[in-house]
């Protein structure tokens, strides 16, 4: 049992972490980087390029469904 737990822990710690918006190797797409820079310049207001905002909204749809299901007050 201890060997199985150790193997599972090793697998999780050695696997690559995929953060939302990041590509393998710790690289971000150019559109998201531009949005981050623009957000810093505007005092926290995010201004996305048009093609990026359409792409991001498509990717976020499943997450919106999950959030509405688990957090109905937001």
Curated annotation (Swiss-Prot):
Q: Which residues carry this modification: Pyrrolidone carboxylic acid?
A: 16
The subcellular location is: Secreted
| Signal listed as a keyword | yes
Provide the GO MF annotations for this entry. Answer: gonadotropin hormone-releasing hormone activity; gonadotropin-releasing hormone receptor binding
Question: According to its record, what are the GO cellular component terms?
Answer: extracellular space
**What domain of life does the UniProt record list for this protein's source?**
Eukaryota
Which keywords describe this protein according to UniProt?
Amidation, Cleavage on pair of basic residues, Hormone, Pyrrolidone carboxylic acid, Secreted, Signal
Which InterPro entries does UniProt cross-reference here?
A: GnRH, Gonadoliberin
Q: State where it is primarily located.
A: secreted
Can the keyword Secreted be found in this entry's annotation?
Answer: yes
Q: Which PROSITE patterns match?
A: GNRH
Q: Which Pfam families match?
A: GnRH
Q: Give the similarity note.
A: Belongs to the GnRH family.
Query: What does the UniProt function comment say about this protein?
Result: Stimulates the secretion of gonadotropins.
Q: What is this protein called?
A: Progonadoliberin-3
- Give the organism, scientific name: Oncorhynchus mykiss
